[in-house]
């Protein structure tokens, strides 16, 4: 089945794209998109408008993630080449010289939204939602998604979409400057498209116009400078320094707004390749592919076991004289949730002055290793398999997602290293 279909009515061509197939790193999709743009360029003098819509069937996200998870550092050059070719196709679309209008309905996510941003006008239905969720998978958006969103909305208004992976309603997207109009129904949308074409709308992106100014203030304006002074610290506070993607996105936004558009695309591609091949992205992508019923009795029982292990270790640390503030800081450094309150039967702090106080690193590792050891005990007992254990530990118990989960944490550290560190912490590891 073709990923792109066209229908011509006089001087207007309507293009329908399979949203699930839009992939900047797919040679097959690039060939079809390139053939479409070749056709549009060849007929340019006979056309007065292009309307692009999207089939919004569920995307086969797992297939794309498997491809991304296979990326290695050695393939970074090939990745940059593919992205450069795709960026070139979108630039040809937005410099076509005739109006290109995107009509949007339902969920418009990821690369489908990225392609829509390369159109000169975007009109959506009221129920549509818009998101660039790549940050949740440890990656930066790519293929102009950062450069275009930041230039259309301005630095601050684009942050929820880019840095948080938030889903914007049609009204929010309109207010942010990502849409030009919102229609109540399909008929209303058709009327808005017709009026836009009849009004001889400019076939030009704002940043390609000489008089373009960044919405919300230039980078050297007082409000934006104030925002940039606190934004990095706010990101680190939110992520604990464990998620490189949000900081990479912010860097791509700011650096890209200081240069011409084509250079901004290159900067964005570099940050994507850097984050996509990172262990954090690989772990987050793997977690997203695990299928597990988190509401099942087995998942609930395992989660309860982990919570008890966490509470037990925090009580043991309190008994070793570790203060509440130090416990909280160590848990945060590990990427774990705040320690639970002391249990009713918790031992009082030790009065043995000769016993050395645990170091900060030891406290952090004891919290992590307590959960990892309890996880492997449950896996060994057949209570849960390792994939389910990883997902439950992250989603229900707050084990740091960047590690890939409590079972995967041991694989990452290495079984021998894990056993040695457990021994150094005086924590007897379960059978590995």
Where are these regions (language model features)?
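Glycine- (often His-adjacent) and acidic-residue-rich active-site loop
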Residues: 46, 54-85, 136-139
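Hydrophobic, secondary-structure "cap" segments at the distal end of domains
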Residues: 145-156
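Substrate-binding/catalytic subdomain of NAD(P)-dependent oxidoreductase enzymes
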Residues: 179, 246, 252-254, 259-277, ...
């Amino acid at each position: 089945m073709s990923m792109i279909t066209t229908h011509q009515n006089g001087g207007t061509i309507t293009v329908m794209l399979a949203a699930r197939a839009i992939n900047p790193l797919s040679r097959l999709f690039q060939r079809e998109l390139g053939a479409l743009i070749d056709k549009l360029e060849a007929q340019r003098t006979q056309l007065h408008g292009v309307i692009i819509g999207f089939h919004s069937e569920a995307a086969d996200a797992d297939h794309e993630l498997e491809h991304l998870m296979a990326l290695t550092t050695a393939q970074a050059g090939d990745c940059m080449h593919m992205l450069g070719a795709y960026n070139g196709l979108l630039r040809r679309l937005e410099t076509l010289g005739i109006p290109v209008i995107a009509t949007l309905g339902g969920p418009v996510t990821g690369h489908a939204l990225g392609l829509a941003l390369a159109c000169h006008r975007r009109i959506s239905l009221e129920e549509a939602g818009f998101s660039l969720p790549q940050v949740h998978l440890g990656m930066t958006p790519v293929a102009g998604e950062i450069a275009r969103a930041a230039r259309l909305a301005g630095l601050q208004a684009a942050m929820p979409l880019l840095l948080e992976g938030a889903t914007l309603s049609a009204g929010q997207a309109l207010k942010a400057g990502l849409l030009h109009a919102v229609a109540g129904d399909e008929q209303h949308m058709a009327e808005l498209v017709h009026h836009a074409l009849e009004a001889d709308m400019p076939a030009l992106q704002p940043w390609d116009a000489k008089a373009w100014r960044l919405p919300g203030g230039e980078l050297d304006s007082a409000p934006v400078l104030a925002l940039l002074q606190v934004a990095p610290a706010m990101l680190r506070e939110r992520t604990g320094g464990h998620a490189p993607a949000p900081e990479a996105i912010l860097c791509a936004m700011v650096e890209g707004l200081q240069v011409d558009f084509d250079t901004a695309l290159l900067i964005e591609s570099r940050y994507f390749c850097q984050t996509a091949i990172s262990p954090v992205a690989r772990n987050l992508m793997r977690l997203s592919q695990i299928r597990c019923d988190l509401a099942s009795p087995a998942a609930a029982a395992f989660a309860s076991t982990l919570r008890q292990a966490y509470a037990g270790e925090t009580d043991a640390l309190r008994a070793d004289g570790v203060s509440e503030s130090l416990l909280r800081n160590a848990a945060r450094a590990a990427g774990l949730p705040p320690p639970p309150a002391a249990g009713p039967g918790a031992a009082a702090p030790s009065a043995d002055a000769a016993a050395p106080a645990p170091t900060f690193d030891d406290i952090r590792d004891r919290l992590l290793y307590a959960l990892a050891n309890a996880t492997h005990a449950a896996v060994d007992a057949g209570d849960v398999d390792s994939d389910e254990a990883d997902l439950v530990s992250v989603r229900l118990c707050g084990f740091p997602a960047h590690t890939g989960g409590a079972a995967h944490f041991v694989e990452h550290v290495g079984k021998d290293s894990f056993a040695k560190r457990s021994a150094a912490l005086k924590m007897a590891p379960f059978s590995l």
